[in-house]
């Protein structure tokens, strides 16, 4: 299952839907799927 935008994500277990970027704030924690520009 993929993760919708603005929700918590991590690889490889919970990748973002639609090839969105999973961006982490602090190292490898607090990662969220980014919205497209």
From Swiss-Prot:
It holds the Pfam family Toxin_9. One of its GO terms (cellular component) is extracellular region. InterPro entries: Spidertoxin. The keyword tRNA-binding does not apply. The keyword Secreted applies. Expressed by the venom gland. It is found in: Secreted. One of its GO terms (molecular function) is toxin activity. Keywords: Calcium channel impairing toxin, Disulfide bond, Ion channel impairing toxin, Knottin, Neurotoxin, Secreted, Toxin, Voltage-gated calcium channel impairing toxin. It comes from the Eukaryota. Antagonist of L-type calcium channels (Cav1/CACNA1). Belongs to the neurotoxin 02 (plectoxin) family. The presence of a 'disulfide through disulfide knot' structurally defines this protein as a knottin. This is U10-ctenitoxin-Co1a. It comes from Ctenus ornatus. The lineage of its organism: Eukaryota, Metazoa, Ecdysozoa, Arthropoda, Chelicerata.
């Amino acid at each position: 299952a993929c993760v919708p935008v603005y929700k918590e994500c991590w690889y490889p277990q919970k990748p973002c839907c639609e090839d969105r970027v999973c961006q982490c704030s602090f190292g490898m924690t607090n990662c969220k799927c980014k919205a497209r520009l």
